[in-house]
Swiss-Prot record:
It comes from the Eukaryota. Coiled coil: none annotated. Transmembrane segments: none annotated. Belongs to the MnmG family. PROSITE patterns: GIDA_1, GIDA_2. This is Protein MTO1 homolog, mitochondrial. NCBIfam families: mnmG_gidA (TIGR00136). InterPro entries: FAD/NAD-bd_sf, GIDA_C_N, MnmG, MnmG-rel, MnmG-rel_CS, MnmG_C, MnmG_C_subdom, MnmG_C_subdom_sf. Its cofactor is FAD. SUPFAM superfamilies: FAD/NAD(P)-binding domain. Involved in the 5-carboxymethylaminomethyl modification (mnm(5)s(2)U34) of the wobble uridine base in mitochondrial tRNAs. GO terms for biological process: mitochondrial tRNA wobble uridine modification; tRNA methylation. The lineage of its organism: Eukaryota, Metazoa, Ecdysozoa, Nematoda, Chromadorea.
């Protein structure tokens, strides 16, 4: 009897495969689902179908900047937000006091439940097949991808390929001074694909990351840690989720603790037996290992959070304690922390080094510049984190489908979304360290908020066939209600004296008695609630969520007006391309330092050039003058 994989291979020869996605991680799942959703016959190739949707490191989604990405993936009808809302066990939003613009949606996730829900979603997606196996070679003819060759020599022809191999390219795991080839504990690395990239002239780099040990829950004395309660009013990730599936009482707390002098002593005494310390490969700046923390701040105490890995899981994840020491040293370190004196380790922490492709070799659609029809997404592009991977995955999947169907690709500008900021930073400036999304990277973060991600991106996704009819119906209804309420509240105007007669809570307000204000002004200035608005409009059918969105829009309205001119300027700069063969050394009036930085960064457009550290306004003026009246460019002849 034929195996499912063999039967699928035979079907692949008889029917067209529009898109092949290599890798079943967060980028791969989003990419495969998006391509299929857009109407392309899609095959997801993975070494093991049982690891699809695996949360390789932390049991959480979201955070500052990252929560914005999840909302934007959801606005493009991606999967991860909805799956998180079906598997979250603790909601703890960050930055609530700093305002809606930088609110960090975050939740602890049940690993097992998330993976099960994701696999169910992938398996039920129309036009999407799963194939188990390892890809040995990318088949390219005349600069265009035409298929893949599997390790068993089977060839599958296709129009487009999306590569989402995560940390598996020529990957090596290490603990202490011991190293061995693997992309994840117990899973082999993908070496042949790296060779295929090099064969086709791609520039590869090397990065590293790590993961903490997993601890046995029943060996921990939680009473010595500070209990951190979940949010009483959790905020869902998806616009389609009205209420989260788990009650406040059933959510699990996290626990806060700190390292101490003894941890510092043990760590510093064992640094000489740590491969990571000896290695020159760059590690994540914003998710450092304990070794990196001790090297930079040898005398400081560092925070750690104990996080549950699932509702019924016996394991605890120590957030902030990524370790690559040998296992016995990890045990010694952990047992020096109060509450962990008797801790047992289920799985020691480890580090992993892997190849990545310089993302400056990509277009803004995430298609490679060297090979037509080849798209890259996720950690292969130098990023770190589930959310960054998912964001790239949904864009790559939409654009691979568009390419396969000879339709225009979708680009998100940095003025439209954090996805645009992410992709623009990668493709324009590249990266020499694992890239993490931060709100500080976005120039228009007061506009690029989690609450309005659907308003910003869902119509764009619909134009590229990425939005289901169900989501579109919900979105158009929401947008219509918001526009209607905005218009009604803007048109209803009267003096503050009259408003005080209608809304009792305004009676104590002494200012602006003679000033004419609209109901829209009052909502965000005086934080009116649903009952207040009902008094204004004599309407009891106003939804709490629509009112909250209206308040936020009002809060940032003046800033939006001020930003319009700047947004237009950045859009113009982004559209001003800098040719690949531009010779910056011929530009008169530019300092040698700026020339060297421009030569090294090779920005793709004027907007990217302005973001290079050390590039002066004078240098930008010279560059703009050159782009209008270009001097002779550097010869590309060999």
């Amino acid at each position: 009897m034929l195996s499912k994989s063999t039967r699928l291979l035979r079907r692949c020869f008889q029917t067209d495969v529009d898109v092949i996605v290599i890798g079943g991680g967060h980028a791969g799942c989003e990419s495969a689902a998006a391509a299929a959703r857009c109407g392309s016959n899609t095959v997801l190739v993975t070494q093991n179908k049982n690891t699809i949707g695996e949360m390789s490191c932390n049991p959480s989604f979201g955070g500052i900047g990252k929560g914005h990405l999840i909302r934007e993936v959801d606005a493009l009808d991606g999967l991860c937000a909805r799956i998180c809302d079906k598997s979250a066990i603790t909601y703890q939003a960050l930055n609530r006091a700093q305002g809606p613009a930088v609110l960090g949606l975050r939740a602890q996730i049940d690993r097992k439940l998330y993976k099960t829900q994701m696999q169910n979603e992938i398996n039920s997606t129309k036009r999407l097949e799963i194939l188990e196996g390892e890809v040995a070679e990318l088949l390219v003819e005349n600069g265009k991808i035409v298929g893949i060759r599997m390790m068993n020599e089977t060839v599958i022809r296709t129009k487009c390929v999306v590569i989402t191999t995560g940390t598996f390219l020529r990957a090596q795991i290490y603990q202490g001074m011991k190293t061995w080839p693997a992309g994840r504990i117990g899973e082999k690395s993908s070496d042949r694909l790296s060779e295929s990239f090099l064969k086709h002239g791609f520039e590869l780099g090397r990065l590293r990351t790590g993961t903490p040990p997993r601890l046995m829950k029943d060996s921990i004395n939680f009473s010595k840690f500070e209990r951190v309660a979940p949010d009483r009013t959790p905020i869902p990730f998806s616009f389609l989720t009205k209420n989260v599936w788990i009650s406040y009482e059933d959510q699990l707390p996290t626990y806060l603790g700190h390292t101490n002098d003894e941890v510092c002593r043990i760590g510093n005494e064992n640094m000489h037996e740590n491969y990571q310390v000896a290695s020159e490969t760059t590690s994540p700046r914003y998710c450092p290992s304990l070794e990196s923390k001790l090297l930079r701040f040898p005398k400081l105490h560092h925070r750690l959070f104990l996080e549950h890995e699932g509702l019924d899981s016996p394991h605890i994840y120590p957030q902030g304690m990524s370790l690559t020491f040998k296992p016995e040293v990890q045990t010694q370190l952990l047992r020096a922390i109060p509450g962990l004196e008797n801790v047992e380790i289920f799985q020691p922490g480890y580090g992993v080094q892997y190849d990545f492709v310089n993302p400056k070799q990509l277009k803004r659609t995430l298609e490679t510049r060297k090979v037509e029809g080849m798209f890259l997404a996720g950690q292969i592009n130098g990023t770190t984190g589930y959310e960054e991977a998912a964001a790239q995955g949904v864009v790559a999947g939409i654009n691979a489908s568009a390419r396969a169907q000879n339709e225009p690709g979708m680009e998100v500008s940095r003025t439209e979304g954090y996805i645009g900021v992410l992709i623009d930073d990668l493709t324009s400036l590249g990266t020499n360290e694992p890239y993490r999304m931060l709100t500080s990277r976005a120039e228009f973060r007061l506009y690029l908020r989690p609450d309005n991600a659907d308003i910003r991106l869902t119509e764009l996704g619909r134009r590229h066939n990425a939005i289901s009819d169900n989501r579109w119906a919900i979105f158009t209804e929401t947008k219509g209600e918001l526009n209607n309420l905005t218009q009604r509240t803007e048109e209803m105007k009267m003096s503050m004296v009259k408003w005080k007669r209608i809304i009792p809570k305004l009676a104590a307000t002494s200012r602006n008695d003679g000033k004419v204000l609209s109901a829209f002004d009052l909502i965000h200035r005086y934080d009116l609630d649903k009952s207040d608005l009902e008094l204004c409009l004599k309407d009891k059918n106003i939804g709490e969520d629509i009112l909250e969105r209206l308040k936020i829009e009002g809060r940032y309205q003046m800033e939006h007006e001020r930003m319009k001119a700047k947004k237009q300027e950045i859009d113009r700069e982004s559209a001003t391309a800098i040719p690949d063969n531009t010779d910056f050394s011929t530009m008169r009036g530019m300092s040698l330092e700026c020339i060297e930085k421009l030569e090294r960064a090779r920005p793709r457009n004027l907007a990217a050039a302005t973001r290079i550290s050390g590039i002066t306004p004078e240098a930008i003026v010279v560059l703009m003058r050159h782009l209008k009246n270009p001097a002779p460019v550097r010869s590309s002849a060999v």
